[in-house]
Amino acid sequence: MKIFVINPGSTSTKIALFIDEKPVWAAGAHHTADDLSEFHHVNEQYAYRKDFVLRLLAEADIPLDFDAVIARGGLLKPTPGGVYGINEQMKHDLLNARMEHACNLGALIADEIARECHCPAYIADPEVVDELQPAARLTGIPEIERISIFHALNSKAVSRKYAASIGKHYEELNLIVVHLGGGISVGAHCKGRVIDVNNALNGEGPFSPERAGTIPADQLAELCFSGKYTLKQIKKMLNGKGGLTAHLGMNDVVTIARKASEGEEPYKGVLDAMLYTVAKQAGAMYVTLRGQVDAIILTGGIAHSDYCVGILKGQIDYLAPVVLMPGEDEMGSLAYNALGALKGELPLQVYRPE
């Protein structure tokens, strides 16, 4: 089956054609600041991004005869994981999303191309997948509720692949999935549902190459009201300029890990501290799963680092077997989900938020 995959990022658009799960063609480009400067809101980029995708297809002489089109899910209202058919409610919510990101355009572009192909259009496991158990939502401040934002697509895809590799279904296993990238999410996967996970985007859990993670609340409040920073600057500290970037002036984990492996400070101390916060979060998810954990999966780009994996395994491998599944194959994960929906192996969900 021919599956067309669309993945719009903040400064890039990636597309690929799969025959079943095999990639046969891929293209994309980085969009410069000049390219996007005329657009004041991400929604205004719709025609630009759609025309870019169609132009690449035309240049490669690829006809619009796909069996399915699937896009990276956008920042929708909280919804359970799975494969979703793109419907009018979804498109409305993406166009009116509270959070602005280019991934919100993926489903809109996929839907239009699918209409020309007379084929189904899907998204799968968007970042806002919310399967939290009730106790995981409450905080000590009634006005503040924990929310679920994490690397759902990759986390669930590697979970399914691991389950298949041992002859099981994802829904039969309890897993801790540690996604190690620019942001870090550590989730408790209980029989196919992520019942607890840190908010990997907005300042919770481990610190990461670009994000601050959990910060002592009193000191953060004092910083906010010190008069030194705007709200925008504080938010940038939490997401974008926090973590390794704040301490070391860089987010390049390859370079930092090399220096750390040679014992060079402050690189070793800061990187080891980050990994310590990751291990603590994995331990918390072990408690969430009541110690019944089939495996701990390490995934994402940082899982390619022997240094980081070695430090982490030394802190958590007594909890459960540690499985290494490095990298983040978003395009392959999306194709896998579309194929599963087409074959009826994965149930097709209806987007109908409460």
Predicted features and spans:
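Short glycine-rich, Thr/Ser-proximal phosphate-binding strand/loop in the N-terminal lobe
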Residues: 3-44
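Phosphate/pyrophosphate-binding loops at sites that engage ATP/ADP/AMP, CoA/4′-phosphopantetheine
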Residues: 55-68, 165-169, 282-294
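Short beta-strand-loop/turn "lid" adjacent to the catalytic site in phosphate-handling enzymes
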Residues: 57-103, 120, 128-140
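Glycine-rich phosphate-binding loop plus the immediately following alpha-helix
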Residues: 105-111, 123, 138, 143-174, ...
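Adenine-nucleotide phosphate-binding core of ATP-dependent small-molecule kinases
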Residues: 236-290
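Glycine-rich phosphate-binding loops at beta-strand->alpha-helix junctions
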Residues: 293-312
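Conserved phosphate-binding/catalytic loops in two-lobed NTP-binding clefts
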Residues: 306, 310-336
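Structural signal for terminal/edge beta-strands and the immediately following C-terminal loop/tail
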Residues: 326-354
